[in-house]
From Swiss-Prot:
It catalyses: L-threonine + hydrogencarbonate + ATP = L-threonylcarbamoyladenylate + diphosphate + H2O. It comes from the Bacteria. Keywords: ATP-binding, Cytoplasm, Nucleotide-binding, Nucleotidyltransferase, Transferase, tRNA processing. The keyword Amino-acid biosynthesis does not apply. This is Threonylcarbamoyl-AMP synthase. Belongs to the SUA5 family. TsaC subfamily. GO terms for biological process: regulation of translational fidelity; tRNA threonylcarbamoyladenosine modification. One of its GO terms (cellular component) is cytoplasm. PANTHER family: SUA5, THREONYLCARBAMOYL-AMP SYNTHASE. It is an enzyme of class 2 (transferase).
Length: 187
């Protein structure tokens, strides 16, 4: 498993690699959201059913526009979303037509977040798009809180480990439905 800096990860991701990287609260596993083979590999590693869908984490809102259909949201709904970003809030938003079901699962929406974590922002800047994100843990194990824990669980399984520090969030992000405003998970 290669250890890389956030700015140097682009080649691994562009080649379809699954990587681990520090986020606000735990290490995440991620890949290119436009590469179905990479997404399938990520789902296999996690033993996660595709029907559940995945989260996209972006460095800025513009990176999310190819994936979400903001025309289905009112100006007030969008203003509320923007008031929470960047930060530890994940929003369920309508998907653009034609988006891979591997990302949206069995839903007509997708979970998205604009991060405030400098390392994740650098990673997204390096690949010039959001990254698929799910917690770095095997089924039944706690999410990895260190690079050593990532190596223990994923050595020989993933393409690389991004070097960096976890953020200061003690819990996962709050999840809110952008259309209804309903809090789905309190972070």
């Amino acid at each position: 498993m290669l250890e890389v800096l956030p700015a140097d990860v682009a080649e691994l991701v562009e080649q379809g690699g699954v990587i681990a990287y520090p986020t606000e609260a735990v290490y995440g596993l991620g890949c290119d959201p436009d590469n179905d083979d990479a997404i399938e590999r990520l789902l296999e590693i996690k033993l996660r059913p595709w029907q559940k869908g995945l989260i996209l984490v972006a460095g800025d809102y513009q990176q999310l526009l190819p994936y979400i259909d903001e025309s289905q949201l009112s100006a007030e709904q969008l203003a509320f979303v923007h008031s929470k970003w960047p930060g530890p809030f994940t929003f369920i938003m309508p998907v653009k037509p034609g988006l891979s079901n591997l990302l949206s699962g069995s839903f007509d929406s997708i979970a998205v977040r604009v991060t405030a974590h400098e390392g994740v922002k650098a990673l997204c800047a390096a690949i010039n798009k959001p990254i698929v994100s799910t917690s770095a843990n095997l089924t039944g194990q706690d999410p990895a809180l260190s690079g050593a824990a990532v190596k223990q669980q994923f050595e020989g399984i993933i393409a690389g480990l991004v070097i960096g520090d976890l953020g200061i969030q003690a819990s996962p992000s709050t999840i809110i439905d952008a259309k209804s405003g309903q809090v789905i998970r309190k972070g």
